[in-house]
Structures are given as structure tokens and as C-alpha cells.
Amino acid sequence: MSLNLVSEQLLAANGLKHQDLFAILGQLAERRLDYGDLYFQSSYHESWVLEDRIIKDGSYNIDQGVGVRAISGEKTGFAYADQISLLALEQSAQAARTIVRDSGDGKVQTLGAVEHSPLYTSVDPLQSMSREEKLDILRRVDKVAREADKRVQEVTASLSGVYELILVAATDGTLAADVRPLVRLSVSVLVEEDGKRERGASGGGGRFGYEFFLADLDGEVRADAWAKEAVRMALVNLSAVAAPAGTMPVVLGAGWPGVLLHEAVGHGLEGDFNRRGTSVFSGQVGELVASELCTVVDDGTMVDRRGSVAIDDEGTPGQYNVLIENGILKGYMQDKLNARLMGMTPTGNGRRESYAHLPMPRMTNTYMLPGKSTPQEIIESVEYGIYAPNFGGGQVDITSGKFVFSTSEAYLIENGKVTKPVKGATLIGSGIETMQQISMVGNDLKLDNGVGVCGKEGQSLPVGVGQPTLKVDNLTVGGTA
């Protein structure tokens, strides 16, 4: 269904047919290439921002174009055009294939539709509500947050939606298309008491229409729940004391704290870093790289999730990839280029920000599978340490695996009980060492609410993260107490 719909909107509307794509791929193959592809994209994006009870910003953007890639060995020729036409395709193909002078046979495998499971709706979220209905969601969030506590001074809420159509045709016979909706709601609040100010934030989204935000979440409208959560987090930090410093046990909460796993481990398991030998995990397949309690997967096949892809941006169907199993490194996330050069199989992780960018190995939804311990058992096992259920930003060095992460919500654990909230706690360590220090894995796997944005080499993409509650026996905590 996607292929027919997208072909009509991206190709037929611009006077193109599948035969034209086959002919352009044939032009690429007139040089001695290992692979060539055409990537068509049309995206519609809107965003709205409410601040101080006023709609302060609204934007709408349409972008479409085509990227043409030619690969020979490790060399890549790439050209793109911000219009979709036969002339633009021909000129881009001419430019992309100039990396190779040797003649090829001009043969291309017959294009065949790639079969894949529908993982999300093909409804255009931008058309799923009127403008006033969208703005009413923001006004609702503002009202709920302010009514939640009189100490709330400022509320900022933003709503964004994307409707994206993509089509891929390649010299290996790939012909695939996808329709990708994506929505996100974010809320940030500022609370003040006795001259002391703190912020809290919440939100979420996924591959839905905007009605998702008005649906039920545990007996409450989802948008309302997130507004109250932002207020709760801000109030927690209002009463927080300075975090202790030193090496101690750290309990990481379920869900969004999986961002540490994403950064400190996930990036190091992307194929390009490992082919170049620049990852701490290079050459470690089959080796014990984590506690035997740890199984980590990257799963592009989750229904409606922010990071999911029915097909990746090279036309490979999204897959469920086991990266680490019982502590043993099983494999890397691959795109077509790095898979071919490493003698491996593409894993559905070839992703790109747009037609104007080259694809590379990227994560989809990366998470750790649940274990057998209850969260309560994990907390009770700690005499003195930190419980971190929410994270802020972080940085990681792919080569060494070293990371620094700041917590946005954290508590002291004393004598097996969560006691007072702390602020200013940063977690410092290295990916492999931290994974090997995991001594308990919870039975409460949770994925994030759908807010993840991953950056790599200047390209931003939607991703998902998750994990159960985890106990790390020894982690360096940077604090101010």
C-alpha cells in the first residue's frame, strides 16, 4: 500500500515512473560500482509553541528532493537536488558516478517491491486536527500545569508534527517506500518558592496523529499526565539537597535512563565505528563485554514507536537485532555499505536525516531486556548510594567509551530506602566497565515516552530508548556536597 501511495505522490506527481528510476540506476551502473541508490523524500513539518499563556511561535515547512548515491569500494559519490524531476535525477546521477572512471556493464537487478510489516498509521498527523484543536492541546497543558501547584510561575509547551514520504530504488533491485507520521508534545515548567527556582520537563510522542495526546493514560488524559509530571519533577528539585560525590552504587530507573545505554554502549555498536576500528567494541564479537545479566537489543519493529522504521532509508525492512546477549557481544548495527565491507548482513539500521544527507548505521529503539529482580529488591540491596530515575544531557567518547551524564531527578538511598532528593549529580564512567558492574536487572522494562533525538555527524533522527531498573555496583558520582 505504501509503495502505491508514495509512488503516486512522489513520482507520478512529478512526471516519473518506476521505469525512469530503473533507467537512472542503469546510468549509474555504466561505471564499475558496487552499489547505487536513489532516495526520494517529501516532508511536511509544523510546530507550535505556547509561552506565558500566549502562542509565541508557529511554523510550517515543506521540503522535498532526491539524493543519488554511487559506491565503489569505500568511496562514495553523492549528489542531491531539492526538486524531483527527470532532469534533476539525470544531473545528480552524472555527478554521483564521477568518483569512478572504470566502465561498468550498465546492468541493474530488476526492481522488486520490498515486503515489510506496517508498523504505524499512514494518516497525515498535520491533517488529523484543525489548527484550533492543536492550539487547544497547548492551552490545556498550560492550564493543567498551573492548576497542579500554586508555585508554578512559567509554563512552556510545544507541539510538533511531521508527515514524511520516502521511496528508495537501488541497483541491487530494492524498491521500497514508507509513510512516516511523527508527533511530539513537550512541556517545561518553572516553579518558585522563597526565591528559589527549579525547572521540570516532560512530554512524549510517537508515530500517531495528534489525537494520541488526548487519549487515556492510566485513567488520565495523556497530555494532562505529562503536564503534572513536569510540575512534580520541578517540585522535587525545589526540595533537593546537594548530591554527594564519590564512587558508590547507583540504581538507574526504568525507561528514559536507557539514554545512558544508548550513548555509552549503543553508538559504540554501530558498524561504521567498528569497521574503522575506532570503537571500544571493535573486534569484540563473541567476547564478554557486559554482566551476564545484560541482553541489549535494537528493535526497529516496535509498533507506533518514535524510533521504529518499517524500512530503513536504504529499503531494508526494520529488524529486531540482538546486540549483546547474556553479556556476550553478538554483532553490530549495519547499513549496506559497512555490512558489505565487513562481510556482514544489513540489519535495517541505515538511516539518514533527509535526501540531502548520506545514510549511516544508526539506532532505532535500543533497550535492555528485563531481568528477575523487583525494583524494590534492587533499592533494598543498597546501603548507601544514588537512585536516578530521570536524566538530562550527556556526552560519550566512542573510542574510549567514557561518558558523563547529568541527572534531572535523583535521590539518596540510605539503608535500603529512597530518602531525600539530590540535585547536581553527574554520573561518570565508561560503557564496558559500567555494563560489567551491573549486578541486578529489574523485571520492569519500560521505554521512554517518545522524545528521543539522536545526533551523529551533524544528522538528527528520532530514536527510542529503554531499560528496566538497574543496579550498577560502582559508579563515580560527581556532586557538590
From Swiss-Prot:
Gene Ontology BP term (one): protein processing
The keyword Hydrolase is assigned to this record: yes
Keywords: Hydrolase, Metalloprotease, Protease
One GO molecular-function entry: zinc ion binding
Tree of life domain: Bacteria
Enzyme Commission code(s) on record: 3.4.-.-
Organism: Escherichia coli (strain K12)
Top EC class of this enzyme: hydrolase
Other observations noted: In strains containing the pMccB17 plasmid, required for the maturation and secretion of the antibiotic bacteriocin microcin B17 (MccB17).
A cellular component annotation (GO) from this entry: peptidase complex
Entry function: Metalloprotease involved in CcdA degradation. Suppresses the inhibitory activity of the carbon storage regulator (CsrA).
Family note: Belongs to the peptidase U62 family.
Protein's name according to its UniProt entry: Metalloprotease TldD
